[in-house]
Amino acid sequence: MTSPWSAFPVQIPQPSIRGLSQITKSLFISNGVAANNKLLLSSNQITTVINVSVEVANTFYEDIQYVQVPVVDAPVARLSNFFDSVADRIHSVEMQKGRTLLHCAAGVSRSAALCLAYLMKYHAMSLVDAHTWTKSCRPIIRPNSGFWEQLIHYELQLFGKNTMQMMDSPMGRIPDIYEKETRLMIPL
């Protein structure tokens, strides 16, 4: 396992919500539109695109490898079935000096959840730390509640403890890291 910060950029790049958001030296997140933009892919030296959606079609470019992860953005979807295989693929691409773009339709829920799983597995980051880092790079991330439950379970599997938990709110089950902002919107 590499140290938690060894693959991170020396300076945190400016967060982007329309283009590609750089998470580590070799991992980016985006939405489906940006993922099909050849100029963005080539200027960021992307060698592998992982499409975590059923609704976004790939535009295949010959110099890029593509992986399809057909998962809908619904709390009942079993994204956790792909935590290890996607994390392993991202790590493999990095070891070959490549760069991975992980995307879903909006770059908010599915791709973010898989990014968090990767950071936990290969950078030994807690779920809270992985979320804090990823949100600093891409402020719009917000995995759905079902993905959070799966990530919390995955953190327990990896480390034998949890750094966050789900809680009840007027908006339904939410991770406790959202308690403060939820309280500001709706008194709990």
Swiss-Prot record:
The gene is Dusp18. Coiled coil: none annotated. Gene3D superfamilies: Protein tyrosine phosphatase superfamily. Its EC number is 3.1.3.16, 3.1.3.48. It is a peripheral membrane protein. Transmembrane segments: none annotated. Can dephosphorylate single and diphosphorylated synthetic MAPK peptides, with preference for the phosphotyrosine and diphosphorylated forms over phosphothreonine. In vitro, dephosphorylates p-nitrophenyl phosphate (pNPP). Keywords: Cytoplasm, Hydrolase, Membrane, Mitochondrion, Mitochondrion inner membrane, Nucleus, Protein phosphatase. GO terms for biological process: dephosphorylation; peptidyl-threonine dephosphorylation; peptidyl-tyrosine dephosphorylation; protein localization to organelle; protein targeting to membrane; protein targeting to mitochondrion; response to antibiotic. Residues 19-160 form the Tyrosine-protein phosphatase domain. The active site is at C104. InterPro entries: Atypical_DUSP_subfamB (IPR020420), Dual-sp_phosphatase_cat-dom (IPR000340), Prot-tyrosine_phosphatase-like (IPR029021), Tyr_Pase_AS (IPR016130), Tyr_Pase_dom (IPR000387), TYR_PHOSPHATASE_DUAL_dom (IPR020422). Residues 95-141 are annotated as: Sufficient for mitochondrial localization. It is an enzyme of class 3 (hydrolase). Its main location: cytoplasm. SUPFAM superfamilies: (Phosphotyrosine protein) phosphatases II. GO terms for molecular function: MAP kinase tyrosine/serine/threonine phosphatase activity; phosphatase activity; protein serine/threonine phosphatase activity; protein tyrosine phosphatase activity; protein tyrosine/serine/threonine phosphatase activity. One of its GO terms (cellular component) is nucleoplasm. It catalyses: O-phospho-L-tyrosyl-[protein] + H2O = L-tyrosyl-[protein] + phosphate; O-phospho-L-seryl-[protein] + H2O = L-seryl-[protein] + phosphate; O-phospho-L-threonyl-[protein] + H2O = L-threonyl-[protein] + phosphate. Belongs to the protein-tyrosine phosphatase family. Non-receptor class dual specificity subfamily. It is found in: Cytoplasm; Nucleus; Mitochondrion inner membrane. It holds the Pfam family DSPc. This is Dual specificity protein phosphatase 18.
